[in-house]
Each structure stands twice: as C-alpha cells, then as structure tokens.
Regions:
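A short beta-turn/loop motif at secondary-structure boundaries
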Residues: 34-37, 59-61, 95-98
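N-terminal beta-strand motif that seeds the catalytic metal site of vicinal oxygen chelate
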Residues: 1-16, 67-69, 119-136
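Core segments of cupin and vicinal oxygen chelate
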Residues: 2, 9-51
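Vicinal oxygen chelate
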Residues: 4-13, 42-45, 60-136, ...
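Short, positively charged
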Residues: 20-24, 80-86, 128
Length: 136
C-alpha cells in the first residue's frame, strides 16, 4: 500500500482572489473546479506542489485557514483497516464521489488528515498527472 503527501486544503474567503494570486505570482494552474461536500472546490497545481481551496471563509479563527492535509493512497480500505485495527477512529466513514473516495482522521495535535484514493479511469490526462497516478 503506497501513500504520499499530496496537498494542503485551505479555506478561501474570496476564492477568485486566491486563485488569481497563486496563478499570477506562482504560475498556478487550475486542474479541477467542482462542487464537492457542499462547497466549490478548486484544485491548483503550483509547480510540483498542490493546493486545494474551499470556497468559504475559515470556520475557526484559532486554527486559521488550513483545513486539512491530504494523503493519497492506492488502497483506502486497507489504510482504513490498518488505522482502525490500531485504535485510530475515523471522523466518519468513507465518502465516495465515484472518481474520488475519502475519509478523515485526526493526527496528534488535532491535525485533520484526509486519506483519499482516486480512480484514474474517470479522469482526464491532466487530472491523472495531477494525482501522480502514472508515477506511484
């Protein structure tokens, strides 16, 4: 089971302004722009790095605008079984959007981690590259 750090997901009180900032100054490219989990989500590629944005203001001013760290795995069910077998509770069960399925867990210090798996058969060539699915 392979895993790698994939992205940081940020709240954006003005998502258009955030997108413009990262594209104009850092050469970011919008790879996906869609509605997931009730909000507009925009996935940006910035060089080899990745940023995801929620179209909503930060919910907790103490935590700032970082929502979660995304860790991609090639076998979400196996990862979930490994975590739960060792007593790490899931925040909720697996959510499946067809091309993307995920769950969340809390790491030490209450860092929210999104564990996710994507199905490259449902993605474009650019999206497959974004998720590094041809280079595990």
């Amino acid at each position: 089971m392979a895993c790698h750090l994939h992205h940081t997901h940020l709240f954006a009180s003005d998502i258009s302004k955030s997108i413009q900032f990262y594209t104009e100054f850092f050469g970011g490219q919008v790879v996906m722009d869609l509605k997931m989990a009730g909000s507009r989500n925009v996935f940006l590629s910035v060089g080899r790095g990745k940023l995801h944005f929620y179209d909503q203001a930060p919910k907790n001013p103490v935590r700032g605008n970082i929502h979660h760290i995304g860790i991609q795995t090639d076998n979400l069910e196996e990862m979930v079984n490994k975590l739960t077998a060792r007593g790490v509770p899931l925040k909720k069960g697996i959510t499946d959007f067809g091309f993307w399925k995920y769950t969340t867990v809390l790491a030490p210090d209450n860092v929210l981690i999104e564990l996710f798996q994507v199905d490259k058969t449902q993605l474009s060539k650019e999206q497959t590259a974004y998720f590094d699915l041809d280079n595990p």
